[in-house]
C-alpha cells in the first residue's frame, strides 16, 4: 500500500510540474497579446481594428496546431516513458515539420494575397491598410510559431518543460521591450508588427534549440 501511495504521489507531482509550467506558458502568450494590443491602440481605432483583423488568423492556426500537438504529447510520452528518447525525438520533429509546412502555406498565401483573408470581413480602407501591413510583416512567421507550439506540446510528453517555458518568457519580454520603446520614441506601427514577428521566430527557433538539450537526450527518471 505504501508503494502504491508513493507511486501515486510521484505521478501527481509530475502532473503538477507540467501543469504549472503550462500555466506560466499560457500567461506569457496572453500577456504578449495584451501588450501588443495595448501598444497598437496608441495608433488609433483603425490601427487596432486592422491588427484585430490580421491577428484573427491565429484562430485558424491554433486548433490545427493543437490537433497535431495533442497527439504528440501522448506519442512522445509513451516513448519517453519507455526510455525510447530517440524515437520520441523523431516523432516530435516530424510533427513540428508538418505544422511548419501546413501553417507556412496558409500564412504565406495570406501574406502574398491578403484579400483572401480580409474579404471575409467588412472593413474600411484605413483599417484594411493596417491589416495588410500586419499580414505582410507577421504572416510569414506564423509557421515558426506553429512549429514551436507543436514542439511545446511534444515537450509535455517528456514531463520536462522548464526550458520551453523560458522560451515563452523570453518572447514576452522581447516583444514587451520593443513595444515600450516604440511607444516611448514614437516609432512607426510597423516596429510593433516586426516585434510580433520576432517573437514568433523566437518561439520556433527557441523550442527547436530545446530539442538539442538534455531533456531530449537523456532517460526519463
Predicted regions and their residues:
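Residue-level signature of transmembrane alpha-helical cores of multipass secondary-active transporters
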Residues: 14, 18-26, 38, 59, ...
Amino acid at each position: 500500500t505504501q508503494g502504491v501511495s508513493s507511486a501515486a504521489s510521484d505521478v501527481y507531482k509530475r502532473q503538477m510540474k507540467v501543469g504549472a509550467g503550462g500555466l506560466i506558458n499560457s500567461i506569457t502568450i496572453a500577456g504578449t497579446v495584451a501588450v501588443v494590443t495595448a501598444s497598437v491602440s496608441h495608433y488609433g481605432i483603425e490601427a487596432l481594428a486592422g491588427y484585430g483583423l490580421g491577428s484573427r488568423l491565429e484562430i485558424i492556426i491554433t486548433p490545427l496546431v493543437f490537433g497535431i500537438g495533442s497527439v504528440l504529447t501522448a506519442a512522445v510520452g509513451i516513448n519517453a516513458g519507455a526510455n525510447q528518447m530517440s524515437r520520441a525525438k523523431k516523432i516530435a520533429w516530424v510533427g513540428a515539420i508538418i505544422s511548419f509546412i501546413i501553417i507556412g502555406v496558409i500564412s504565406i498565401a495570406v501574406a502574398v494575397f491578403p484579400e483572401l483573408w480580409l474579404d471575409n470581413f467588412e472593413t474600411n480602407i484605413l483599417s484594411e491598410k493596417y491589416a495588410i501591413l500586419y499580414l505582410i510583416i507577421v504572416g510569414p512567421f506564423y509557421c515558426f510559431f506553429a512549429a514551436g507550439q507543436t514542439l511545446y506540446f511534444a515537450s509535455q510528453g517528456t514531463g520536462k518543460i522548464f526550458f520551453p517555458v523560458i522560451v515563452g518568457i523570453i518572447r514576452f519580454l522581447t516583444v514587451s521591450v520593443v513595444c515600450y520603446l516604440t511607444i516611448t520614441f514614437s516609432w512607426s506601427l510597423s516596429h510593433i508588427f516586426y516585434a510580433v514577428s520576432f517573437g514568433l521566430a523566437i518561439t520556433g527557433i527557441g523550442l527547436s534549440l530545446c530539442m538539442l538539450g538534455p531533456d531530449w537526450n537523456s532517460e526519463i527518471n
